[in-house]
């Protein structure tokens, strides 16, 4: 682990007045990320702004503390750097490096699916990062395209460590993203680094196929059932080595899942799918990148969605509004509403309850006039009970739909 770089005067206390705030780069569950220029040096950063009232209301303070404590102590080529934090009466601020190539999510959306060599390149950098974190006893727990950024040189950087946690053995916190969630999390049997390698297998499948392996048109229940059954249909055009690797990652039995065995990440790195990879060169960023963003300057935001810097109440809502590309009632391309177009999370609602709150954005779940705004879920025995709350594309309240189904015995 390399020493953490210092960006600001150690003696100086940062405040909002030190920065000239720019455009919004993204919206989150209780805040937004904005481009900002540090007045003393003119350098640009990404500042995550979180409304304190919303953070407390959603019981996310511990997640924020955990993210800060983890990021302040690590430095790695494929992890976004956090350079400082500060706060005022209403808001918590976290200062990150500005990664100007945009989200990996956007690349997948535009390319639909990736050639084997390109997918292998990105999978290499992700595998190195997960291995690095696991060696520090850190489980990431939220791997998905939306949490991967592309830097100016075309390399990946993992961001958003809100669900990351230092784990010695297992943890039982209910968290993750439905399409990427491991079966042991759904069953609430405790999970460890193996959950990250499951998500890695899901992401590799999505890169190569253009959709997640457990996608179900019916929404969450169908996805969870497919995950628990563990049945994956691989497209015929995916090479055999990739299929073999994914079949060893998407294994429900933790004692047989690659990445969670005696050799750890070594089983993955030694797999034939990665035969052409020099891992030391990859770690030093010496492998030729498949795509370099066309960046005009360090403050270029052209690879990010455009957001209106509207009323401040937007920063306090539970979920962000639909991006422009997804607000049409009748989409030109139905694939725009596949699960990988969404930003969905499961959050534990309290320290003692087994209930979860699932936030789903950018997703219509086959309902052209409604999108899922929030879903409160509770696991009791083998039953998963959901109360789904929908809103219209223009933000008006929609129907509430209670459902209870048996997921497992």
PLM segments and residue spans:
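Conserved N-lobe beta3->alphaC-helix segment of eukaryotic protein kinase catalytic domains
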Residues: 44, 49-75
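Conserved N-lobe ATP-binding subsite of Hanks-type protein kinase domains
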Residues: 32
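Eukaryotic Ser/Thr kinase distal regulatory-tail detector
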Residues: 242, 283-409
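Activation segment signature within eukaryotic-like protein kinase domains
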Residues: 122-123
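Conserved short submotifs of the Hanks-type protein kinase catalytic core
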Residues: 90-103
């Amino acid at each position: 682990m390399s020493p953490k770089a210092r960006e600001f005067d150690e003696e100086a206390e940062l405040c909002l007045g030190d920065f000239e705030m720019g455009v919004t780069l993204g919206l989150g569950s209780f805040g937004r990320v904005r481009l900002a220029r540090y007045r003393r040096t003119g350098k640009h950063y990404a500042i995550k702004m979180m409304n304190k009232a919303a953070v407390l209301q959603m019981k996310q303070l511990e997640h924020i503390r955990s993210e800060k404590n983890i990021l302040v102590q690590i430095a790695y080529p494929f992890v976004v750097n956090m350079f400082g934090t500060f706060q005022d009466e209403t808001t918590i601020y976290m200062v990150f490096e500005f990664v100007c190539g945009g989200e990996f999510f956007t690349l997948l959306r535009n390319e639909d699916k990736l050639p084997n060599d390109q997918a292998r390149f990105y999978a290499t950098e992700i595998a190195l990062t997960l291995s690095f974190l696991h060696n520090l006893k850190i489980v990431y727990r939220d791997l998905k395209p939306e949490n991967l950024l592309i830097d100016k040189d075309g390399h990946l950087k993992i961001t958003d460590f809100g669900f990351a946690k230092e784990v010695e053995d297992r943890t039982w916190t209910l968290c993750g993203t439905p399409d990427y969630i491991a079966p042991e999390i759904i069953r609430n049997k405790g999970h460890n680094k193996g959950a990250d390698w499951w998500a890695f297998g899901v992401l590799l499948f999505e890169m190569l196929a253009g959709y997640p392996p457990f996608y179900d048109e019916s929404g969450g229940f169908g996805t969870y059932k497919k995950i628990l059954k563990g049945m994956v249909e691989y497209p015929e055009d995916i090479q055999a080595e990739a299929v073999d690797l994914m079949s060893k990652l998407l294994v429900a039995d933790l004692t047989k899942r690659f990445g969670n065995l005696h050799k750890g990440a070594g089983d993955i790195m030694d797999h034939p799918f990665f035969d052409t990879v020099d891992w030391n060169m990859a770690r030093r960023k010496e492998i030729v990148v498949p795509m370099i963003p066309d960046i005009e300057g360090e403050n270029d935001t052209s690879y990010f969605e455009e957001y209106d810097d509207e009323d401040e109440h937007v920063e306090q809502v539970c979920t962000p509004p639909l991006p422009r590309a997804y607000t049409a009632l009748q989409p030109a391309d139905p694939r725009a509403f596949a699960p990988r177009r969404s930003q969905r999370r499961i959050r534990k609602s309290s320290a003692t309850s087994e209930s979860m709150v699932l936030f789903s954005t950018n997703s219509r779940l086959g309902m052209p006039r409604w999108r899922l705004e929030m879903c409160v879920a509770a696991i009791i025995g083998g039953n998963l009970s959901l109360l789904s709350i929908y809103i219209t594309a223009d933000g008006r309240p929609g129907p509430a739909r209670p459902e209870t189904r048996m997921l497992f015995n």
